[in-house]
């Protein structure tokens, strides 16, 4: 929990567009947050470590919003590892793994006005599907 909170606190730019700043309570809530009609066994919350230090976290839901789609709820790379290919490498590995087990698409939401997040997902092959309260993006796999 401390490692996740520290990673979040180091990413203040994200929280400028997605307030409020993370707390222990909000992280605990995120660990069990689910979209409608999904169960905990459909959710993965994964930490990626380098040299014993948390480098990134990934939260995704299998089979949402359709059976062949995986929804990324959160992906955050530690500030000190950004710009070094760590995030793109994780997404590349996730994409290959999901394709192998039969998924055809990955979707996610990006906060409007967050140029860093939007550019990251565009660079990794995601395209805009629609804009609501946030920008929905997808990548066909």
Where would I find each of the regions flagged by the language model?
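Conserved acetyl-CoA-binding loop of GNAT-fold acetyltransferases
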Residues: 122-131
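Active-site acidic-Proline motif in GNAT/NAT acetyltransferases
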Residues: 78-80, 84, 112-113
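Short glycine-rich hinge loops at helix-strand junctions in the catalytic core
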Residues: 85, 102, 125
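Residues forming the Rossmann-fold NAD(P)(H) cofactor-binding site
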Residues: 88
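Terminal substrate-recognition subdomain of acyl/acetyltransferases
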Residues: 134-141
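Acetyl-CoA-dependent GNAT
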Residues: 2-80, 91-93, 97, 130-134
């Amino acid at each position: 929990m401390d490692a996740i909170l520290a990673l979040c606190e180091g990413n203040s730019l994200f929280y400028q567009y997605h307030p409020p700043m993370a707390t222990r309570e909000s992280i605990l809530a995120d660990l069990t947050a689910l979209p409608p009609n999904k169960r905990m066994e459909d959710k993965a919350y994964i930490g990626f470590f380098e040299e014993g230090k948390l480098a990134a976290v990934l939260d995704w839901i299998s089979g949402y919003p359709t059976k062949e789609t995986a929804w990324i709820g959160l992906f955050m790379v530690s500030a000190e590892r950004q710009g070094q290919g760590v995030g793109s490498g994780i997404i590349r590995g996730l994409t290959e793994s999901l394709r192998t087990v039969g998924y055809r698409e990955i979707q996610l939401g990006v906060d409007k006005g967050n140029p860093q997040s939007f550019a990251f997902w565009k660079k990794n092959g995601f395209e805009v599907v629609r804009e609501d309260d946030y920008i929905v993006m997808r990548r066909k796999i």
